[in-house]
A protein has these predicted regions:
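Charged, low-complexity intrinsically disordered terminal segments
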Residues: 1-519
């Protein structure tokens, strides 16, 4: 219930059943690989299918041959088909603050209604706000932006507004600043997909990224078979129960607890491990955000950085969490030979594609520049920061081109340390993912799996540059980016260009009014 102290999810008690089978991990790079893999996995379900996504548009087209051969066209069709086969379906979709993120909130409800109106009896779908509610004082702090958004909401047709938004217009509302950000699906406790990619048409892309900038979307997920799938199931069961306890909106006839929910194990390396960020409503008098319960993403990243000896490779949508920057800097000082390759989008999505210039975006970029400065002082020329740009000239109306090329948007969350540790999942390297939002990722240590993922990504980004030196060396990535910067877009090799630090510094403004966990 709101305001109640949430019990921390159990992590240390192992299951009593046999868990000795081998774990198999397959990287899925971009939606071209992930979407069909998810469809095929769903079609293999025999007993149960559990899904938890931030964005899941019921209208998204199906891509796998098996689904299309059955005459199915959209994800709504596939969910109905799966439930009618007798598979127990539970879908947990993220909801969003009805005032500050009204468009996302309405989209979430529209998709939930689309699924829910077609699903047969026995299927269950919850669209859940995170339980955290900001203290009432923040309604006064944000009075003017709230009033502006409520005024805009009055221009929207009544039938397009949700019940939450109708209540908001009558003055009955809470600020809901935290969300479920994870992206995962698990079938029969046997196999799962976990990563950074949600499901809608906007996110469809291929490793060629041969589309207009606003259609590009680089992301990474994993298909996992073996013991971690049971842990993903247990994590889903915990999140599902919390949504029920908070009386989240149900779009089907029933919502029931997951039977035999189990516990998320904490196996020692080299066994792969599911890690989470989990928070609750702390009910502090002046609280804006959530009380952190589990910060396993932060802990595992710091532990991996402490063991780094030669090379750290990171792909992230954001790099704003100062504790991680300081941990990287400490690793650089301990290991004079340690190198860092950091790959990020040129700017945040809202800046590139929506032209956002508000103080919150400028402050968020200032947090990122601060983290880059911390690392650059420690690593010096052992660090390179790069952004992917298509080897094609920008068109007249393309948003924020870089050195004449069309940008590729990066949404991946990948950290690879030497040949012994990789982390792939939903958590960005920002305070929100480390402390507030509900997140889930997989840490794995098998050398073949770790190096296989790193080499696949390097070959995609570097292209022919991959063969010109050590792909684990920051120097090779820097040289590839600088050589491309000196060429015309159509003459470039691969995607790498130097991160546009100068224009991001001009854009950023440090305004430390709100907690860094909000960004």
């Amino acid at each position: 219930m709101p305001g109640a102290e949430m019990k921390e999810p159990e992590t240390l008690r192992p299951r009593q059943d046999a868990r000795a089978e081998e774990t198999r991990i397959q990287p899925l790079i971009t939606a071209e690989e992930m979407f069909p893999a998810l469809e095929r996995m769903v079609m293999r379900a025999e007993r149960e299918l559990f899904l938890s996504f931030r964005i899941f548009d019921a209208r998204t087209r199906l891509r796998s041959e098996g689904a299309l051969e059955l005459g199915l066209k959209t994800w709504a069709d596939l969910m109905v088909h799966t439930a009618e086969r007798g598979v127990k379906l539970r879908m947990l979709l993220a909801d969003f603050d009805p005032i500050f993120t009204g468009d996302l909130h309405r989209s979430a409800w529209a998709s939930a209604r689309n699924f829910g109106s077609r699903l047969p009896d026995g299927a269950e779908l919850i669209c859940a706000l995170h339980e955290c509610r900001s203290a009432p004082v923040w309604k006064y702090v944000f009075h003017f932006p709230i009033r502006k958004r409520l005024d805009s909401m009055r221009d929207i047709p009544d039938e397009s507004l949700t019940p939450f938004q109708h209540r908001s217009l009558r003055g009955d509302w809470d600020l809901r600043p935290v969300t479920l950000h994870q992206k995962l699906a698990v079938v029969d406790g046997r196999e799962a997909i976990i990563g950074g990619l949600d499901v809608d048409e906007r996110r469809w892309d291929t490793p060629d990224h041969d589309q207009s900038p606003e259609e590009t979307w680089h992301d990474v997920s994993l298909h996992v078979e073996g013991p971690p799938a049971q842990d993903i199931r247990a994590h889903f069961a915990h999140c599902w129960q919390r949504a029920i306890d908070d009386d989240a909106t149900c779009f089907t006839a029933e919502k029931s607890p997951v039977p035999d929910p189990g516990h998320v194990r904490k196996p020692a390396p080299p066994a792969p491990r599911v890690i989470r960020t989990i928070s609750c409503d702390g009910s502090r008098p002046l609280q804006l955000g959530a009380k952190t319960m589990l910060r396993e993403h932060e802990e595992e990243h710091i532990a991996a950085f402490e063991k780094a000896e030669r090379s750290i490779y990171i792909e992230s949508q954001f790099f704003r969490h100062a504790p991680l920057a300081r941990s990287l800097a400490a690793a650089a000082k301990r290991r004079p030979e340690l190198e860092l390759i950091l790959l990020m989008p040129t700017e945040p999505e809202e800046v590139i594609f929506q032209g956002a210039t508000g103080f919150e975006m400028r402050h968020a970029q200032a947090l990122q520049m601060r983290c880059l400065d911390i690392c650059q002082r420690a690593f010096g020329d052992r660090m390179t920061t790069v952004s992917p740009v298509q080897p094609r000239p920008a068109q007249t109306n393309d948003p924020l081109p870089l050195r004449g090329g069309r940008v590729v948007y990066v949404h991946a969350k990948v950290t690879i340390v030497d040949d012994h540790t990789a982390i792939v999942g939903s958590a960005n390297l920002n305070g929100r993912s480390m402390r507030w939002d509900t997140e889930a990722s997989l840490v794995f240590h098998g050398r073949e799996d770790v190096m296989g993922l790193r080499d696949r990504l390097a070959r995609i980004w570097l292209d022919e540059h991959y063969e010109e030196g050590d792909p684990h060396s920051a120097a090779l990535w820097r040289r590839a980016a600088e050589e491309n910067a000196a060429r015309k877009p159509e003459d470039r090799v691969g995607f790498m260009l130097p991160y546009p630090e100068r224009r991001n510094r001009r854009f950023s403004r440090f305004l430390p009014i709100l907690p860094p966990e909000m960004f």
